[in-house]
Amino acid sequence: GCCPPQWCGPGCTSPCC
């Protein structure tokens, strides 16, 4: 699943971030 937008960035490994 995708990270919520506030989680995207350094440390987020989701391909949709």
From Swiss-Prot:
Modified positions (4-hydroxyproline) are: P4, P5, P10, P15
The UniProt comment on domains reads: The cysteine framework is III (CC-C-C-CC).
Q: Name one GO cellular component term.
A: extracellular region
Modifications the protein undergoes after translation, according to the UniProt entry: Contains 3 disulfide bonds. They are not indicated here, since framework III presents two different connectivities (I-IV, II-V, III-VI and I-V, II-VI, III-IV).
Which cysteine residues pair off into disulfide bonds? none
- According to UniProt, the name of this protein is Conotoxin Reg12a
Q: Which GO terms describe its molecular function?
A: toxin activity
Where on the tree of life does the source sit, at the highest rank?
A: Eukaryota
Q: In which tissues is it expressed?
A: Expressed by the venom duct.
- Name the family: Belongs to the conotoxin M superfamily.
Q: Keywords assigned by UniProt? A: Disulfide bond, Hydroxylation, Secreted, Toxin
**Localization in the cell:** Secreted
* Keyword flag Secreted: yes
